[in-house]
């Protein structure tokens, strides 16, 4: 352990003891990291620690932050997109989405993404690597400092496929819950759905977190297998009917309903027949549908569905007994909305 971010009180007490310090020095480090949320995440800034202890930690390579801000982009609606650089000079983006009572942090779990969904900017440049838990957590601290308020909600809907980084994902969730004091019920993990990984997520959550109270969101985006394969190449490996069965098992094991994300693409998946197919697919188990308007990116020719089609689609789902919401896009003027995050500054 060299990065202190993500460490528990016990971890930090042990660090202090290893250096011949009293255990309370570890608690001081813990308070400095999580309770004060300092921007200067530098060992030198922990002035409550003896100077010689700080120097030894620095010499031995301990640190609190690995990321550096490269760009800040503030949208007209108050949404903030940050372009961050890692120690190995890769780039990731994260987004702070404010409302009057909440600040939602949209976090990246990987540098890039291997899934290559046809409507999403992130996958156009492929996957570089997965993020460490400390790099995931650091995004929260930067959002909080830049927006001068505490994050209340977390969505893993930034760059990357979270279930392909499942161990670091769950370690970060454990720290978000235990150390950042954000309830699991205010955390959403979004996945395009990877074979066998939904059941693995449930099992590993009980191992690492002792329970599973976060929300699982499936990026479904289609009501039938043929359509899904045209917009999500990886869908060829995981049929919709199997995704639904695995989600039903997840609900039984965790007691948590599943959300299904459905991006409305004009002429592709927005007809009433698609709404009927989706209703039949989801009928009979605990779930919720989020309808999302498409956010334009340069490389593809998909178009937003009309507001009329969106409303008709929603009404048909409601009439068929499906719980549904319309998700409002935020940060559009700064390419900070769903599907628009990238690895570099081209997205400005």
Curated annotation (Swiss-Prot):
Binds 1 [4Fe-4S] cluster. The cluster is coordinated with 3 cysteines and an exchangeable S-adenosyl-L-methionine. S-adenosyl-L-methionine binds at residues 160-161, 190, 219-221, 295. Its EC number is 2.1.1.192. PROSITE patterns: RADICAL_SAM (PS51918). Its cofactor is [4Fe-4S] cluster. It comes from Prochlorococcus marinus (strain AS9601). Disulfide bonds join 106-338. GO terms for biological process: rRNA base methylation; tRNA methylation. One of its GO terms (molecular function) is tRNA (adenine(37)-C2)-methyltransferase activity. The keyword ATP-binding does not apply. Residues 99-333 form the Radical SAM core domain. The active site is at 93 (proton acceptor), 338 (s-methylcysteine intermediate). The gene is rlmN. Specifically methylates position 2 of adenine 2503 in 23S rRNA and position 2 of adenine 37 in tRNAs. This is Probable dual-specificity RNA methyltransferase RlmN. It is an enzyme of class 2 (transferase). The lineage of its organism: Bacteria, Bacillati, Cyanobacteriota, Cyanophyceae, Synechococcales.
């Amino acid at each position: 352990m060299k990065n202190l971010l993500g460490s528990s009180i016990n971890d930090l007490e042990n660090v202090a003891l290893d250096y011949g310090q009293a255990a309370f020095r570890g608690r001081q480090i813990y308070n400095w990291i999580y309770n004060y949320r300092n921007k200067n995440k530098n060992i030198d800034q922990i002035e409550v620690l003896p100077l010689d202890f700080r120097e030894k930690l620095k010499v031995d390579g301990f640190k609190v932050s690995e990321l550096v801000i490269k760009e800040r982009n503030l949208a007209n609606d108050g949404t903030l997109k940050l372009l961050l650089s890692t120690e190995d000079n890769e780039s990731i983006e994260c987004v702070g989405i404010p409302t009057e009572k909440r600040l939602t942090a949209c976090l990246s779990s990987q540098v890039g993404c291997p899934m290559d969904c046809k409507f999403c900017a992130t996958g156009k440049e492929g996957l570089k690597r997965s993020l460490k838990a400390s790099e995931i957590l650091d995004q929260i601290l930067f959002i909080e400092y830049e927006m001068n308020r505490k994050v209340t909600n977390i969505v893993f809907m930034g760059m990357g496929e979270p279930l392909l980084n499942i161990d670091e994902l769950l370690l970060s969730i454990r720290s978000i819950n235990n150390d950042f004091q954000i309830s699991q019920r205010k955390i959403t993990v979004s996945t395009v759905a990877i074979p066998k990984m939904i059941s693995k997520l449930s099992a590993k959550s009980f191992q690492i977190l002792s329970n599973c109270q976060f929300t699982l969101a499936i990026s479904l985006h289609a009501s039938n297998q043929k359509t899904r394969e045209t917009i999500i190449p990886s869908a060829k490996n995981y049929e919709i009917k199997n995704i639904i069965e695995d989600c039903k098992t997840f609900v039984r094991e965790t007691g948590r309903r599943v959300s299904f994300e459905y991006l409305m693409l004009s002429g592709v998946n927005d007809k009433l027949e698609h709404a009927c197919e989706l209703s039949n697919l989801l009928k009979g188990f605990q779930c919720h549908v989020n309808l999302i308007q498409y956010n334009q990116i340069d490389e593809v020719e998909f178009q937003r569905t009309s507001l009329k089609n969106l409303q008709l689609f929603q009404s048909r789902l409601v009439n068929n007994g499906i719980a549904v919401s319309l998700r409002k896009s935020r940060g559009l003027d700064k390419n900070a909305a769903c599907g628009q995050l990238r690895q570099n500054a081209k997205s400005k």
